[in-house]
Amino acid sequence: VTSNVPDFRDPKVFWNEDTQLWNLILAAGQQMSIYSSKNLKDWTFESHFGEGYGNHDGVWECPDLIKMGNKWVLLCNINPGGPYGGSATQYFVGHFDGHKFTCESAPTVTKWLDYGKDQYATVTFNNAPNGRIVAIPWMSNWQYGNHVPTLQFRSANGLPRELGLFSYQGESYISVK
């Protein structure tokens, strides 16, 4: 999969049990692009998500798309544009049919996975024991990530977190343990 779109990067590939296809989600400028494949070699573009949804104050990157119960969650890391400046992870809850992600919230709603400054580039692990969804972030922020007092070290991973979903006043949110 190639493109001339700026910031076309960070592919996440996963097996979609519902459609019996591989899906790939990647950042493409200010949106996410979704592809499907039967064989991991030949990819078909399916759709984009993001225009008009959430925060667009920075570059969208490091996407993830996870099934949680009967809903899907799209993680979108953004830099800058976090609630306290610099990097952060926003997320969208909705439905995914293997071809298109549809957000259940209004386009103006922005949901943050974490409000701390040192949580970015969150990724999840597939097939964790007992069906758990485990995520791990990069424990840093691009506001100062290049200004650490070492030459090679650029911070560390954050603590693994188990993700879940809960509902409050008609909206779905991620819970973190």
For the regions a protein language model found, what residue spans apply to each?
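Carbohydrate-active catalytic/glycan-binding domains of CAZyme proteins
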Residues: 1-177
